[in-house]
């Protein structure tokens, strides 16, 4: 079924003892802005959503098994070229019609796709404290016999992060992003950290606490996304919150626009 109305969403993510998104420019340390607030890039969020959607059976172009550019190029080029290439690409790959794609590959000349789903930069509610833990490597990969080598693990002690995004109904009509696709996106948001554990993100260290899902009654929406997001107010109950229960979260619904709330 065609998506006829705009959707806005906001997700609250708790982080405890994990690195939610490493910064390659800072040796993989958790991302922060100039004020010390934790940051998760939209690319990171989309990667996790792609992984969950792939597990749900959706066909994904930029998948983990083929994240190298040449592999993705071969996969994209396998679809027969033609004037309707972008339409067929949107029909085949969920992430193309959802997030868009630039087909900048050799021997493939096709217009780019503007996706229906946009996700903002994700920030923590308060500045985060990053802890560095020193570790040793006992297995040497050289002939150096001086003993063990030192390394480090960096993690956020605690942070509550806020993901904000929207589904543009006008773009959805162009890419074929349907109401059923939107429902799959909602489920993927709720399952974002399923099967996502690693040394940097131990199981249970990152959790989706709550999802606000606003369904407008028109393609343009009754209110701007910024005004919708401001209806959710988050305040810490103490100077040093350590868990989700240390926050008070209120929602002042706008007339004619009441969110669906998932989680606790």
What are these regions (language model features)?
Residues 1-264:
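RNA-binding basic/glycine-rich loop and surface signature characteristic of RAMP-family CRISPR effectors
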């Amino acid at each position: 079924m065609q998506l006829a109305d705009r959707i806005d969403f906001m997700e609250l993510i708790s982080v405890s003892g994990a690195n939610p998104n490493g910064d390659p420019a800072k040796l993989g340390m958790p991302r922060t802005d100039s004020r010390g607030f934790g940051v998760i890039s939209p690319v990171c969020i989309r990667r996790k959503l792609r992984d969950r959607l792939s597990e749900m059976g959706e066909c994904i172009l930029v998948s983990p098994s083929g994240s190298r550019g040449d592999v993705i190029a071969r996969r994209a080029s396998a679809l027969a070229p033609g004037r309707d290439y972008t339409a067929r690409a949107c029909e085949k790959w969920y992430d193309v019609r959802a997030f868009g794609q630039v087909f900048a590959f050799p021997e493939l000349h096709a217009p780019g796709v503007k996706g229906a789903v946009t996700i903002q930069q994700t920030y923590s509610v308060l500045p985060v404290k990053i802890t560095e833990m020193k570790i040793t490597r006992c297995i040497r990969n050289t002939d150096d016999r001086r003993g063990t080598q030192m390394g480090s693990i960096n993690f956020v002690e605690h942070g509550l992060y806020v993901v904000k995004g929207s589904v543009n109904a006008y773009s959805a009509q162009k890419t074929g992003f349907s109401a059923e696709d939107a429902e799959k996106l909602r489920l993927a948001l709720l399952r974002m950290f399923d099967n996502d554990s690693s040394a940097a993100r131990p199981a249970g260290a990152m959790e989706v606490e709550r999802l606000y899902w606003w369904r407008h009654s028109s393609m343009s929406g009754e209110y701007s996304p910024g005004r919708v997001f401001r209806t959710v107010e988050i305040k810490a109950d103490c100077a040093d919150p350590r868990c989700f229960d240390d926050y008070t979260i209120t929602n002042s619904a706008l007339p004619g626009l009441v969110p669906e709330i998932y989680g606790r």
